[in-house]
Amino acid sequence: MSAPPVSIVPSAPAAPDAAASVAPNPPAALPVTVRWLGETPYDACFDAMRAFTDARTPDTDDEIWVVEHPPVYTLGQAGNPAHLLVADSGVPLVKVDRGGQITYHGPGQIVAYLLVDLRRRKLMVRTLVTRIEEAVIETLAAYNLASARKAGAPGIYVESGPHRGAKIAALGLKIRNGCSYHGLSVNVKMDLRPFLAINPCGYAGLETIDMASLGATADWHEVAQTLVRRLIAHLDGATAAAALPQQALEQSND
């Protein structure tokens, strides 16, 4: 990745100025700030996104944080610790407040946290989840990888070939005061062995795969850029993410 790690200090988020808050007619797309956080420990992001969500106001811009974590297992609030099959794996386990069971984050995986005001965007939780899933499916399709949802199993799965049914992306959200945090992960090119020490997302024997194993040669940063564009387009209700204007993507390392 080209972006260096940054310190996350989420004091009260800044509200836009009065001129920026006046919506034109017809209304423009709601702004989204994208923060490229480099390699950042999971605990720092977890604490920061909760603090950001607690401090935000109705005028706070939505944000997407894009990050790569050192190795860590995370267990959702209703997760069963028995899904961690190897107690002495050497990889830390963090209990978190998102939905879902256990998953793994590590180098070579894109993690995108969506800090979104659902009420302002008039989104139901299920609609947000569907739009996130569609953004991931479109991202993978951009690299000639066919993928699909699976009923009753959040995330995105390989649709065809010898790895059909393998999980390539995970998703888990928390909604507090009408705003989301946590998000999704996409496996680009990573060491998949830590997934063997868990029942991924609570499913025994579920194969986990990455884009590189399926023949995709794109690097982490290229895929992350594609994913962010798809996510922003779908947050605005777009059906063709390729139409996203360049100026709509605000990037920040602050």
From Swiss-Prot:
<feature type="binding site">
    <location>
        <begin position="170"/>
        <end position="172"/>
    </location>
    <ligand>
        <name>substrate</name>
    </ligand>
</feature>
<feature type="site" description="Lowers pKa of active site Cys">
    <location>
        <position position="167"/>
    </location>
</feature>
<dbReference type="InterPro" id="IPR004143">
    <property type="entry name" value="BPL_LPL_catalytic"/>
</dbReference>
<feature type="binding site">
    <location>
        <begin position="98"/>
        <end position="105"/>
    </location>
    <ligand>
        <name>substrate</name>
    </ligand>
</feature>
<dbReference type="GO" id="GO:0036211">
    <property type="term" value="P:protein modification process"/>
</dbReference>
<keyword id="KW-0808">Transferase</keyword>
<feature type="active site" description="Acyl-thioester intermediate">
    <location>
        <position position="201"/>
    </location>
</feature>
<feature type="domain" description="BPL/LPL catalytic">
    <location>
        <begin position="58"/>
        <end position="239"/>
    </location>
</feature>
<dbReference type="GO" id="GO:0005737">
    <property type="term" value="C:cytoplasm"/>
</dbReference>
<comment type="function">
    <text>Catalyzes the transfer of endogenously produced octanoic acid from octanoyl-acyl-carrier-protein onto the lipoyl domains of lipoate-dependent enzymes. Lipoyl-ACP can also act as a substrate although octanoyl-ACP is likely to be the physiological substrate.</text>
</comment>
<dbReference type="InterPro" id="IPR020605">
    <property type="entry name" value="Octanoyltransferase_CS"/>
</dbReference>
<keyword id="KW-0963">Cytoplasm</keyword>
<comment type="similarity">
    <text>Belongs to the LipB family.</text>
</comment>
<feature type="binding site">
    <location>
        <begin position="183"/>
        <end position="185"/>
    </location>
    <ligand>
        <name>substrate</name>
    </ligand>
</feature>
<dbReference type="Pfam" id="PF21948">
    <property type="entry name" value="LplA-B_cat"/>
</dbReference>
<dbReference type="InterPro" id="IPR045864">
    <property type="entry name" value="aa-tRNA-synth_II/BPL/LPL"/>
</dbReference>
<dbReference type="GO" id="GO:0033819">
    <property type="term" value="F:lipoyl(octanoyl) transferase activity"/>
</dbReference>
<comment type="pathway">
    <text>Protein modification; protein lipoylation via endogenous pathway; protein N(6)-(lipoyl)lysine from octanoyl-[acyl-carrier-protein]: step 1/2.</text>
</comment>
<dbReference type="InterPro" id="IPR000544">
    <property type="entry name" value="Octanoyltransferase"/>
</dbReference>
<keyword id="KW-0012">Acyltransferase</keyword>
<protein>
    <recommendedName>
        <fullName>Octanoyltransferase</fullName>
        <ecNumber>2.3.1.181</ecNumber>
    </recommendedName>
</protein>
